[in-house]
Amino acid sequence: MKRNSILFIFILLLCIGLQYETIYYTDGSMSAAEYGLMGVSIFLALFYMIPALYFLFCIGKKWELPKNALILSLLGGMFLSGWLSSFANTYIHDLLGILFPDSAFLNAFESAIVAPLVEEPLKLLPLVFVLALIPVRKLKSLFLLGIASGLGFQMIEDIGYIRTDLPEGFDFTISRILERIISGIASHWTFSGLAVVGVYLLYRAYKGQKVGKKQGLIFLALALGTHFLFNSPFVELETELPLAIPLVTAIALYGFYQAYRFVEKNDGLMN
């Protein structure tokens, strides 16, 4: 009975997300030109989405992770974490605007501070449902489920940005999706992979198993810190040779690689 209740709640939240994420395209408010531009932009985004999904499921098969768990985690990132984060970010933005009106600091750093603290926990929320329905016993499986949720979130966020960019015209919309495709090399999928390993290791430490506590703190700090930097004015620094974004990207990828090495070495930690 408990498992059925969890499944129903999960399906309900996914259905809400599906309606929320698609209503703009089905309510008749878009013009023919906007539909065309939307189609072109999504087609471009598929050049990273399809390979990313292919490698995700190939690794899942290699690591013997149940395919249904991977699919549910991916859908959860798209249609559960996405709309919950959107609502949470909006409400927090409105609240901060009331508490600290005309704050130059918040204007510059609100997204950098709020987004990691809101989105990283919510991207892990689908895993709570997935693990309750399909328990896994390997740290690599947990790591990959986190990556899947982050990738799903990243994909739906990119589509959402296409939608909001449409009024700015063809040139702006295309340039923005190309920018997001390039930056996708180290985006939400890396943050979530780092975060899930960090949170699990800290949970183990809370339960009295101290092995990996230091690494857990480092991985979680990397997830939040790199997300902060990507949303901060730091990445807008202009130098003769591009440095800001490559530096943050390198930090994220290096941290992710270290998390992967830890997971490979300690795969049986969940047993």
PLM segments and residue spans:
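Hydrophobic alpha-helical segments at protein termini of multi-pass membrane proteins
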Residues: M1-N271
